[in-house]
Regions:
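N-terminal small/polar loop signature for handling phosphorylated ligands or for N-terminal nucleophile
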Residues: 32, 36, 40-107, 192-250
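Flexible, glycine/charged-enriched surface loops at secondary-structure junctions
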Residues: 37-43, 137-151, 174, 234-237, ...
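Gly/Ser/Thr-enriched, mixed-charge loops and adjacent short helices
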Residues: 13, 108-232
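Phosphate-binding and adjacent anionic-ligand microenvironments
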Residues: 236, 273-391
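Short glycine-centered, acidic/aromatic-flanked micro-motifs in structured strand/loop junctions
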Residues: 47-49, 179-181, 251, 335
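An N-terminal, well-structured beta->alpha segment
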Residues: 1-63, 67-68, 150-175, 381, ...
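General beta-strand structural signal in soluble alpha/beta enzymes
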Residues: 5-6, 46, 72-77, 97-98, ...
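Proline/glycine-rich low-complexity loops and linkers
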Residues: 126-161, 166, 252-325, 332-333
Length: 391
């Protein structure tokens, strides 16, 4: 982790930790680094979730990018993994997401994907941080026709839905599913995708107002979904977080399927089809021992990394593995995506359910979780840096 960039970019309370001034500096620094590395005027995509502060930060970030000569294509409200996919499809030089994922609405963040669809390498983030530290003093500002342009891109959701539809495949006809979109970025994609795949869908958390993202809904608040599934007689429930890079689920009895369980089910299906590269699933040190023991019993190897999907992805890419993720619901399916994708994960899980002929509770019962206690500690950027320095 760098001084400003954590495992998921720059994050903090919008207007306090993450100010407009900071967003503009990030934009200027990123545009300068990309111009230097590509040798041309960079094209940069920007997507965001539904937070009230998103428009403010996008305006400041865009001003910073354009002031150094980068062209910006605004995607509007789209899931984080959509930006990672579209930056490759549209052959852009980078993609930026303005989101704080599963966090409350007062938080926001800025995460940058390279033109490859992967998060920026550490050394590139360090270059941007160096520019931030000196207030971008050494970066010349563009003038005249050198100033960047801003365009609104309206085809992003359509192209992303098409990608998901082709990647998921299969027929979900006969499934009755309750889907919680966390009042976040997943709503429009979900409403187009899952009915098209054949599922009968009821949606929760699809009325964002800028303030209600993740508020009692989504993957960090499963109670309402679990209750709705049981009372409504649904086959299962699906929950995304605010930017849809996470997916959790519950069975028809209202019992949770966490990221470990979803990874285990998908890894088994991939193994059966000869698609489990390296016969290995990559998880983090937070994964439950029950998951590890089950995978051993099925002849599948597991590798553990530090907490953070960034570290999971690094291990997968270095070793050629196809699936990995976190207990929290980040699942990376490297045959189809370069980052965790909640809606892709949900589609693959629902396809597995439809093809199995079983109830979701039967799939959920493949192993029992061992007793486990996880404790979250709140720390600001300075405290995190001090902790890392003391390791």
């Amino acid at each position: 982790m760098g001084k400003y960039f954590g495992t998921d970019g720059v994050r903090g309370v919008a207007g306090a930790d993450l100010t407009c001034e900071m967003a503009m500096l990030i934009g200027r620094g990123a545009a300068a680094v990309l111009t230097s590395s590509t040798g041309h005027k960079p094209r940069i995509l920007i997507g965001k979730d539904t937070r009230q502060s998103g428009d403010m930060l996008e305006a400041a970030l865009t001003a910073g990018l354009c002031s150094v000569g980068a062209d910006v294509e605004s995607l509007g409200v789209v899931p984080t993994p959509a930006v990672a996919y579209l930056v490759r499809k549209y052959n852009a030089d980078a993609g930026v997401v303005i989101s704080a994922s599963h966090n409350p609405m007062e938080f926001n963040g800025i995460k940058i994907f390279a033109g490859t669809g992967y998060k920026l390498p550490d050394d590139v983030e360090e270059e941007i941080e160096a520019h931030i530290d000196d207030k971008c003093a050494g970066i010349p500002l563009a003038t005249g026709d050198g100033v960047g342009r801003v365009t609104r891109r309206i085809d992003g959701i359509k192209d992303y839905v098409e990608h998901l539809y082709e990647s998921i495949g299969g027929d979900l006809s006969g499934l009755n599913v309750c889907i919680d979109c966390a009042n976040g970025a997943s709503a429009e994609v979900a409403r187009q995708l899952f009915p098209r795949l054949g599922a009968k869908c009821t949606f929760l958390g699809v009325s964002p107002d800028g303030r209600n993202i993740n508020a009692g809904v989504g993957s960090t608040h499963l109670d309402n979904l679990e209750k709705a599934v049981v009372e409504g007689g649904f086959d299962c429930g699906i929950a995304f977080d605010g930017d849809a890079d996470r997916c959790l689920a519950c069975d028809e009895k209202g019992q949770e399927l966490d990221g470990d369980k979803i990874i285990a089910l998908l890894a088994m299906a991939m193994k059966d089809k000869g698609r489990l590269d390296g016969n290995t699933a990559v998880v983090t040190v937070m994964s439950n021992l029950g998951f590890v023991k089950y995978m051993e019993s099925q002849g599948i190897n597991t590798e553990k990394t530090a907490v953070g999907d960034r570290y999971v992805l690094e291990n997968m890419r270095e070793n050629g593995y196809a699936i990995g993720g976190e207990q929290s619901g980040h699942v990376i399916l490297l045959h189809h995506a370069t980052t965790g994708d909640g809606e892709l994960t949900a589609g693959k899980l629902l396809r597995l359910l439809a093809e199995s002929g079983k109830k979701m509770s039967e799939l959920n019962g493949i192993y029992a979780q061992y007793p486990q206690v996880l404790v979250n500690v709140v720390a600001n950027a300075t405290q995190k840096a001090a902790y890392k320095a003391d390791e």
